[in-house]
A protein has these predicted regions:
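Secretory targeting and sorting signals
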Residues: 1-27
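Beta-rich, blade/repeat-based domains predominating
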Residues: 34, 72-92, 127-143, 154, ...
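Short loop/turn segments immediately following the C-termini of beta-strands
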Residues: 44-46, 56, 101-102, 111, ...
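Short loop/turn segments immediately following beta-strands, especially the blade-tip
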Residues: 54-62, 109-117, 165-174, 214-223, ...
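A short beta-strand motif characteristic of beta-propeller blades
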Residues: 66-78, 120-126, 177-184, 224-232, ...
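Blade-level signature of beta-propeller repeat domains, shared across WD40, Kelch, NHL, RCC1
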Residues: 357-394
Length: 394
């Protein structure tokens, strides 16, 4: 399968990485700061996909886990997935779910008490589509409800894209839900699929046609299109999306393809029936190029977006009604941070971790309100990957 590409809107296309060889697990030296959590990255390697695992220390620094990287059982694409959510953790923290975009599969890995991922026997299954790029998970009774966005075949104009549902049981096995597949027109190029915090709504982005899908989730786990869906994204190239943690009825979408210094973030109000309406004077200017991925502070007051083509991170404050004010942008070092993509906050919200698809690194920042301060020792290299996609922080 040919690599997916991410339009950087700078007169062409930027491909975030080529396939590289896997590397053996490395010995890890003792670290003075105690381990308080972990960071995982989907390495997206073509010849046998792996997950990179890092110990996260109290000072925010990262060290590779002794056994990292960990095989998923499928194959990555070897290049950027142009998506948000290529790696996810279940709400109870027991499993990681990864897209294997090169083999059209999803893999499940069980997390040990010490944070080490282990492949689940029978845990690699068909995604029921071509080029899975994004995963959404919500609690569903004793199990979890999972939806995957299949971008479509990149060698054939992103044909065959769809959203498909699964039930993840307590043993870590994915079961396809009959009649759950929702097809999208050829050429849509899905970039994200996302549940709201209550698990009652699902949204997805169509990058190539600048549309946002909105669905209501039935008791049977099936998706039902909201009235008027899909909706105009209000900007070209919607890619990343995030519901406000403090308000599941507010949705924010990054528009990546507006051109140089013309990126935007859209803000939507989500009604009870799933319909989307614009908030305030949206879309809100980014004044940067290719804002692709979105993260919102746990208190819902600030939004961060990575500008992949610059590279930089834009910072917004969010008003109670969902309108936004651009605070500024944090410039990144283009020699070590060539293409920032997915980003996630630590559980306490005091650290922000950004995976770089161009340099195969992870950057780390201290967060104080809407201010970002780079942490000493970052970025760190993602061993064995030249095209990482997706990040989990726990």
């Amino acid at each position: 399968m040919k690599p997916l590409k991410l339009a950087a809107t700078l007169g062409g296309v930027v491909t975030l990485g080529l396939a590289g060889p896997a590397v053996a697990a490395q010995a890890v030296a003792p670290h003075a700061s105690p381990v308080v959590g972990h960071v995982y990255v989907n390495d997206n390697t073509a010849a046998g996909n792996t997950i990179g695992g890092f110990d996260r220390h109290a000072d925010g620094s990262l060290t590779p886990e002794a056994g990292s990287p960990y095989a998923t059982g499928g194959n990555g694409s070897g290049a950027g997935t142009a998506s948000q959510g290529a790696l996810q953790e279940t709400p109870d923290g027991r499993f990681l779910l990864a897209v294997d975009a090169g083999s059209d599969q999803i893999s499940v890995l069980r997390l040990s008490g010490s944070g080490v991922p282990h492949r689940v026997v029978g845990g690699t299954v068909s995604s029921h589509g071509s080029s899975p790029v994004s995963i959404a998970i919500t609690a569903w009774g004793r199990d979890d409800l999972v939806y995957v966005a299949n971008a479509g075949d990149p060698t054939n104009g992103y044909s065959g894209g769809n959203y498909t549902g699964f039930e993840l049981d307590r043993a870590g096995i994915l079961h396809h839900i009959a009649e759950s597949t929702v097809a999208v027109p050829d050429g849509s190029q899905l970039g994200d699929v996302l549940f709201n915090s209550t698990g009652t709504s699902v949204v997805g982005t169509r990058v190539a046609t600048s549309l946002v899908d909105s669905f209501n989730v039935g008791r049977n786990g099936l998706l039902y299109a909201a009235p008027g869906s899909p909706y105009a994204a209000q900007g070209p190239g919607p890619l990343g999306s995030e519901f406000r943690p403090t308000n599941p009825n507010q949705l924010f979408v990054s528009n990546a393809h507006g051109g140089p210094n013309n990126g935007t973030i859209s803000a939507f109000s989500v009604s009870r029936n799933g319909s989307l309406t614009s908030i305030g004077a949206g879309p809100f200017a980014d004044n940067q190029t290719a804002p692709c991925w979105v993260e919102i502070s746990h208190d819902g007051r600030f939004l961060f977006t990575t500008n992949t083509a610059v590279p930089s991170i834009s910072r917004y404050s969010i008003a109670p009604n969902g309108s936004m004010t651009l605070i500024g942008s944090t410039a990144l070092d283009p020699t070590t941070q060539k293409g920032p993509i997915d980003l996630r906050l630590s559980p306490g919200g005091q650290k922000l971790y950004v995976v770089d698809g161009g340099a195969a690194t992870i950057s780390a920042f201290r967060v104080s309100g809407g201010t970002l301060t780079p942490l000493a020792g970052a970025p760190v290299t993602v061993p064995g990957s030249v095209a990482p996609a997706g990040i989990v922080v726990d």
